[in-house]
Amino acid sequence: DTVPRVYYADLYTDDGQYMATKSPFFDAINTLLKARVQYVAGGQSMSVDSNDVLTSVRYGKNAMTASDTGTSETRTEGVGVIVSNNAELQLEDGHTVTLHMGAAHKNQAYRALLSTTADGLAYYDTDENAPVAYTDANGDLIFTNESIYGVQNPQVSGYLAVWVPVGAQQDQDARTASDTTTNTSDKVFHSNAALDSQVIYEGFSNFQAFATDSSEYTNVVIAQNADQFKQWGVTSFQLAPQYRSSTDTSFLDSIIQNGYAFTDRYDLGYGTPTQYGAVDHVRA
């Protein structure tokens, strides 16, 4: 069991002011994180076929296996992912890729959340205008070489697609809160739906530019974007190292003042700000 951990520089460029410039991958990660809140729950199955295409399915809450029929809540949850890292992927005629969405999702409409195009990726935040496919009587979504093929572009080297049920409410939350889950072991971490609902965000880069005014301090910008982190489902936020940099230039980390030099000292920004802000910005 693992908890997803998203890195700042996957979403924003390392250089420049904090959160000022989005990376080429921002839209994809933004779409996936929001969808994780809305759809991801229940049991999981993963497999790799003879074409080295990986499929991963989450069945939705109250369904741990493909044979579970679940509840009405299960019906609008769950997600199917298709991944290949082969830019030359070409399925032979008659070959298919199947997402076994499970018995809870028989004869159901699914829509693309994210799909590969010749030029990059297409994103669909709602049911409107999204490509639609239907599961069969076994709950299978079946795709042919008409829709699955390898590409090479700045967004994708291979193939990527994500499918979710049609008809989910925009404010649907498939996560499980920790305070609703009973733990009976003496372990620190418990493998359950509550742990599965966690997301860690490493929210800083060692190489970002120095702030030119107080509005650009990392800790100020983080507070201003709290709603966005909530939409992403972030439950643990790894802040930048709140250290007073030595600035003695004897070591790379003291030159870029990232808080990792040998003589740096922990300081939230008392008196004068650190690279990341003043103590009042942390308190806010």
Curated annotation (Swiss-Prot):
Note: The dextran produced by Leuconostoc mesenteroides CMG713 has a molecular mass of about 2000 kDa and contains exclusively alpha-(1->6) glycosidic linkages in the main chain.
Reaction(s) the record says it catalyses: [(1->6)-alpha-D-glucosyl](n) + sucrose = [(1->6)-alpha-D-glucosyl](n+1) + D-fructose
Membrane spanning residue stretches: none
Enzyme Commission numbers on file: 2.4.1.5
InterPro entries reported for this sequence: Glyco_hydro70cat (IPR003318), Glycoside_hydrolase_SF (IPR017853)
Keywords tagged on the record: Glycosyltransferase, Transferase
One annotated GO biological process: glucan biosynthetic process
Name of this protein: Dextransucrase 1
Purpose: Involved in the production of dextran, an extracellular glucan polymer.
Family indicated by similarity: Belongs to the glycosyl hydrolase 70 family.
UniProt cross-references to Pfam families, sorted A to Z: Glyco_hydro_70
GO molecular function, one term: dextransucrase activity
Top enzyme category: transferase
Gene3D superfamilies assigned: Glucansucrase (3.20.20.470)
Superkingdom in the source lineage: Bacteria
